């Protein structure tokens, strides 16, 4: 809705959906809990903050000048993983 409303004025509206990311807020109590979260991702690891930042920079850059009304999944495949 926001993309449709603001698009005519050249405003792009997108969402960034990150997967598990290795940050201080993502505390893993045990190695097993980290492994569990990693295994939720198709890539079998969590992201580094820089990887999510690059996705955000893409959305904010001219490289995405024709991208609006979309969600960018930077989730390591957690949204498609079936294990």
List the model feature ranges, each with a label.
Residues 8-11, 70:
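Active-site loop of short-chain dehydrogenase/reductase
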Residues 8, 18-40, 51, 81-83:
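A glycine/serine/threonine-rich, flexible loop-to-helix segment
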Residues 41-52, 63:
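A conserved structural motif in NAD(P)-dependent oxidoreductases
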Residues 57, 68-83:
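Short C-terminal tail/terminal secondary-structure segment
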């Amino acid at each position: 809705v926001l993309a449709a409303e603001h698009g005519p004025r050249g405003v792009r509206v997108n969402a960034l959906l990150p997967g598990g990311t290795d940050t201080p807020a993502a505390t893993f109590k045990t190695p097993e809990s980290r492994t569990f979260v990693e295994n939720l991702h198709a890539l079998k690891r969590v992201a580094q903050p820089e990887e999510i930042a690059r996705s955000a920079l893409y959305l904010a850059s001219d490289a995405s000048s024709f991208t609006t009304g979309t969600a960018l999944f930077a989730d390591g495949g957690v949204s498609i993983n079936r294990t």
